[in-house]
UniProtKB/Swiss-Prot annotation:
CDD domains: DHOase_IIa
Protein name per Swiss-Prot or TrEMBL: Dihydroorotase
EC number assigned by the record: 3.5.2.3
Residues involved in substrate binding: H57, L58, R59, N89, H310, F324, G325
GO biological process, one term: purine nucleobase catabolic process
Domain of life assignment: Bacteria
Origin organism lineage: Bacteria, Thermotogati, Deinococcota, Deinococci, Thermales
Entry binding sites for Zn(2+) 2: D147, H174, H233
Cofactor: Zn(2+)
Alphabetical UniProt keywords: Hydrolase, Metal-binding, Pyrimidine biosynthesis, Zinc
Annotated Pfam families: Amidohydro_1
Annotated GO MF terms: allantoinase activity; dihydroorotase activity; zinc ion binding
Protein family according to the UniProt entry: Belongs to the metallo-dependent hydrolases superfamily. DHOase family. Class I DHOase subfamily.
Residues that span the membrane, as ranges: none
Amino acid sequence: MILIRNVRLVDARGERGPADVLIGEGRILSLEGGEAKQVVDGTGCFLAPGFLDLHAHLREPGEEVKEDLFSGLLAAVRGGYTDLVSMPNTKPPVDTPEAVRALKEKAKALGLARLHPAAALTEKQEGKTLTPAGLLREAGAVLLTDDGRTNEDAGVLAAGLLMAAPLGLPVAVHAEDAGLRRNGVMNDGPLADLLGLPGNPPEAEAARIARDLEVLRYALRRSPATPRLHVQHLSTKRGLELVREAKRAGLPVTAEATPHHLTLTEEALRTFDPLFKVAPPLRGEEDREALLEGLLDGTLDAIATDHAPHTLAEKEKDLLRAPFGIPSLEVAFPLLYTELHLKRGFPLQRLVELFTDGPRRVLGLPPLHLEEGAEASLVLLSPKERPVDPSAFASKARYSPWAGWVLGGWPVLTLVAGRIVHEALK
């Protein structure tokens, strides 16, 4: 038995408390206390349901020098995540039931965050032949995506949506038009021109979202089941407007935004620092503000990290040669708690929802609330501030564009079904 005493409760339904949360047999037994072997003083802290990340690259199999299941899932629980969806763009890609099962079994044995593998939409993520979605779902895949690559063939995407619909699997898309994106390394515009860097235009995202929404309309018309499209790492004002319009029209589309697109802009590239190189690129302030509005009005369903670790040697190459990607599993919530909630008054209830029930809805999972009988997958968060120290990361990617930023809202206790998997109470 574990008792978390005198703690404020925050979930998608609101804030309340203080409460004395008694945990046993993997569940919340009471919000009014009781006898327990381990007592945690939650004074000044708040308790939330465990977070779910819809989008993380754990690099296993094939690139374990960058990250592996142990380091990635340990980073996850340190960040308050009890559940995580791993992307399939590994070496080789996760495109078979055997590969999905192998990941799930290894992750389960580690006893950290629960892994929910995404499987490739097409074999080898080549965009040609669809993978066996039914068998992948039976093996434990929770969505289909060729993330890391763009879906250039609209017919293949349509067939994938039609295949996934009766299985209840969402199809997630990296929405960029490859012909427009080309070799861009930052947002296309006056700053890219000034710096002499190739630009990736916002129209590349908007054009692909517009096309994919039309493909979704077709699949919806042709399928007796409901196809579900999920737009990954949305980064532009126009892309957001397209998703908003589609939702108002009743299309079954969901979307996510990342911590980096919510807190950073293209201005970070003025120093040519490759730590800020990411795909899609950091955009302008107008785009960032639009994303924040999208979080509030429900256009965006979830905050997803797009945790993308590389070796420091790779990220220290010049901006043209360094790989795309930012690691953020361990800082995502403190970053947004500080930058959005504390500094801008963003509602804490809504912020927690974007880390919990929002991503759960994308996957078709039931909500997880703080109530008697609920699964005790929980995170205790402290408002105490401290600077981001990448040298202390569990992730193998021990660097960060937010290094030195002073943040509050750090996870100090993470439980998965009643088991403590991370503790930093002192």
